[in-house]
């Protein structure tokens, strides 16, 4: 997977304390939502300015980037993607997997059914005991880990940055860049007009991901 996703997953896998492991799961889900939002916005932006309604819908949550708002933005962006999107997997992933995982059953927003409720309990519940954390982890570990095999399509996208020596690929949890031998046609050159830019590449598809540098 691209490094922005692989790193929090590695932290989750290596963590042994149940409270910290729950937090690591929350971090991984939030970063996944961010990546999906930025990919979707990038794909839409390639076609011109974002639709005005979508711009209005995103204005508040993008200025208040909490997990619940990232979930809302992911759904809004997914619903705005056209049929010929370069990301055909994104909308069904958000609709069929992430939204049910985060929201849980309607009218049953409890910490054992809604991942958003779990995140809010961790953040605002005044702390939890190790015993309770272990119980919650036993409940959430299977559905959390079942999400990630559905992300394999993201591994097909190369997350590329420009370096002094050319280009490097952000892949896996390693701190170093992989070599990325790319030619530089005009669209690629334009996408890297910012030194800190990040570009997602898949075949002849190119999506600028500048928000990942924030």
Give each language-model segment a name.
Residues 107-117, 124-214:
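Polyanionic, low-complexity intrinsically disordered segments
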Residues 3-121:
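Amphipathic, oligomerization/interface secondary-structure segments
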């Amino acid at each position: 997977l691209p490094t922005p996703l692989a790193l929090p997953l590695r932290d989750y896998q290596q963590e042994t304390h149940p409270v910290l492991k729950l937090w690591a799961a929350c971090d991984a889900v939030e970063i996944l939502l961010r990546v999906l939002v930025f990919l979707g916005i990038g794909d839409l932006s390639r076609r011109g300015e974002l639709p005005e309604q979508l711009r209005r819908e995103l204005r508040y949550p993008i200025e208040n980037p909490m997990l619940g708002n990232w979930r809302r933005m992911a759904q809004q962006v997914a619903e705005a993607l056209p049929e010929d999107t370069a990301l055909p997997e994104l909308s069904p992933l958000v609709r069929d997997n992430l939204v049910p995982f985060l929201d849980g059953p309607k009218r049953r927003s409890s910490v054992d059914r809604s991942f958003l409720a779990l995140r809010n309990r961790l953040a605002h519940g005044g702390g939890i005991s190790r015993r309770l954390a272990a119980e919650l982890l036993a409940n959430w570990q299977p559905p959390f880990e079942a999400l990630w095999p559905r992300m394999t399509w993201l591994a097909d996208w190369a997350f590329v940055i420009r370096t002094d020596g050319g280009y490097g690929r952000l892949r896996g949890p390693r701190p170093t860049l992989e070599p990325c031998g790319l030619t530089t046609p005009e669209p690629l050159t334009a996408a890297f007009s910012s030194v800190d830019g990040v570009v997602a590449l898949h075949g002849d598809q190119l999506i600028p991901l500048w928000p990942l540098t924030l």
